[in-house]
Swiss-Prot record:
One of its GO terms (cellular component) is plasma membrane. One of its GO terms (molecular function) is ABC-type D-ribose transporter activity. Its main location: membrane. Part of the ABC transporter complex RbsABC involved in ribose import. Responsible for energy coupling to the transport system. The lineage of its organism: Bacteria, Bacillati, Bacillota, Bacilli, Bacillales. Belongs to the ABC transporter superfamily. Ribose importer (TC 3.A.1.2.1) family. The complex is composed of an ATP-binding protein (RbsA), two transmembrane proteins (RbsC) and a solute-binding protein (RbsB). It comes from Bacillus cereus (strain ATCC 10987 / NRS 248). The keyword Cell membrane applies. Its EC number is 7.5.2.7. The keyword Metal-binding does not apply. Keywords: ATP-binding, Cell membrane, Membrane, Nucleotide-binding, Repeat, Sugar transport, Translocase, Transport. The gene is rbsA. This is Ribose import ATP-binding protein RbsA. CDD domains: ABC_Carb_Monos_I (cd03216), ABC_Carb_Monos_II (cd03215).
Length: 494
């Protein structure tokens, strides 16, 4: 299937989101669609699949002009959209998910052909390298396995083009390898993939071509063998952003935070490490190693069962997030949408939440202080929005992440814990987040950064703490740290 979109335009409430955008994909091609958050990538694909109606432009499929009324119509024609939030119902079986809306029945009796559906589902998944029973509950599978189910569902509707939005955001390295194996197998069979992602290494590994959008406009198309990371970034942001990771200029000082023999039954045990003033401590490990659980314990979300925590040499008890905030510890969670933000609230309201005391006069929240704080934070972090009254759910992923960071900067943290700080964030916003981390450490504060992206860990960390199955696998100095040395410790080696 060959798809060509020309001069596509779209506006919401008079605000242009797409302006003469273009996109073309060939049969059997893996085509990356890139751009900063808010560039219009998802909107363009939603227009292709009938979720949104275009204001102008043409869509041709195999030479014939087409416009789909809804996503179901596009799916029936052979174009499937697998969203970042997977459409899997965890309380249904694998087969029930795959046949949802197209169940096999005995005539018109309403009785399901359960055994047959289980067998077909099992066979379809086996062909994609996933060997699970059709009768198994989908909620018992990993995110990577659920993603393969989504691809199998698309193939059952004879999909010729599969659109994937941030497909590897929550996958382990092994699951990413499995996904790429499936993509490579299917492209040889003529299936095309639109691959929306910010992960450069993956795009240069799996894709054939890149189309770049900027501010809703088509910037250009490049063949992977004929382009470079720097060229793609420059096309995305309209300028060269210089070095990928900003230079570290902070002076590492005394120990600001220490945990000794921290234990949470069933999750991690005897975890001990220190963080110094002016330091970024990177935390690496495989998915399931309990890195996030350790950070949640430090912040008092799920307090330690045993062990000690010291701040500036003094032992402290942290049994709740309030205790942590009093010690000027801030925690930016990996799941910004469900744990970091109140999506229906405005930017101003979200920024105020952990800062109510400092934004109040007496016991009354000061509108003047709140407005000034919002303006200051939006300027400091370059939050792109119409005003502080804009709902955070309408912001791009990068700007949402900046709001999460901004609200915690209000407590003037001496220790900032960042869990997957740049997940789903474009390359320009990543650089801004890295600069914020550097500014904090340059003024003597400390940062703990949990990340599954090893280039990020290596590029930003002064030392690297590696967690393996809930225990400290090792701590590497900057000159000792490499992808190989980190992975060796993460897998239980030395």
């Amino acid at each position: 299937m060959r798809i060509e979109m020309k001069n596509i335009s779209k506006a919401f409430n008079g605000n242009p989101v797409l302006k003469n955008a273009q996109f073309m994909i060939e049969t059997g091609e893996v085509h990356a669609l890139m751009g900063e958050n808010g560039a219009g990538k998802s909107t363009l694909m939603k227009i292709l699949t009938g979720v949104y109606k275009k204001d102008g432009g043409t869509i041709t499929i195999d030479g014939q002009e087409h416009t789909f009324k809804n996503a179901k119509e596009a799916e029936e024609y052979g174009i499937a959209f697998i969203h970042q939030e997977l459409n899997i119902l965890s309380n249904l079986t694998v087969a029930e998910n795959m046949f949802l809306g197209k169940e096999l029945m005995y005539g018109k009796t309403g009785i399901l052909r359960t055994r047959q559906m289980n067998a077909i589902a099992q066979q379809q998944l086996a062909e994609l390298g996933l060997h699970v029973k059709g009768a198994m509950l989908a909620g018992e599978l990993s995110v990577g396995q659920q993603q393969i189910i989504e691809i199998a569902k698309a193939l059952m509707t004879n999909a010729s083009v599969i659109i994937m939005d941030e497909p590897t955001a929550a996958l382990t390295d092994r699951e990413i390898e499995t996904l790429f194996t499936v993509i490579n197998k299917l492209r040889k069979e003529g299936v095309s993939f639109v691959y929306i992602s910010h992960r450069m290494e993956e795009i240069f590994s799996i894709c054939d071509t890149i189309t770049i959008l900027r501010d809703g406009e088509y910037v250009g198309k490049r063949s992977i063998p004929e382009t470079s990371f720097d060229e793609v970034v420059s096309m995305m942001v309209g300028r060269s952003i210089g070095e990928r990771y900003p230079e570290r200029n902070s002076q590492v000082g005394d120990v600001i935070f220490e945990i000794r023999n921290g234990t949470k039954k069933g999750k991690f045990e005897n975890v001990s490490f220190q963080v110094r003033k002016g330091e970024i401590l990177g935390v690496a490990g495989l998915m399931g190693a309990c890195r996030t659980d350790i950070m949640k314990a430090i912040f008092g979300y799920e307090p330690l069962d045993s062990g000690q925590i010291f701040i500036n040499g003094q032992e402290v008890k942290i049994d709740s997030p309030i205790d942590a905030i009093r010690q000027r510890i801030a925690f930016i969670t990996e799941d910004r949408k469900s744990e970091g933000l109140v999506l229906d609230f405005s930017i101003r309201e979200n920024l105020a939440l952990p800062n109510l005391e400092s934004l109040s006069k007496g016991s009354v929240l000061s509108d003047e202080l709140e407005q000034q704080f919002t303006a200051d934070m939006m300027k400091l972090l370059n939050v792109k929005a119409s005003s502080g009254e804009q709902a955070v759910k309408s912001l791009s992923g990068g700007n949402q992440q900046k709001v999460v960071i901004a609200k915690w900067l209000g407590i003037h943290p001496q220790l900032l814990i960042l869990d997957e700080p740049t997940r789903g964030v474009d390359v320009g916003a990543k650089k801004e987040i890295y600069s914020i981390m550097n500014k904090l450490t340059e003024q003597g504060d400390a940062v703990i950064m949990v990340s599954s992206e090893l280039p990020e860990v290596l590029g930003m960390s002064d030392r690297v703490l590696v967690i393996h199955e809930g225990k400290v696998g090792g701590i590497l100095e900057k000159d000792e740290a490499s992808q190989e040395s980190i992975m060796a410790l993460a897998t239980g080696g030395e």
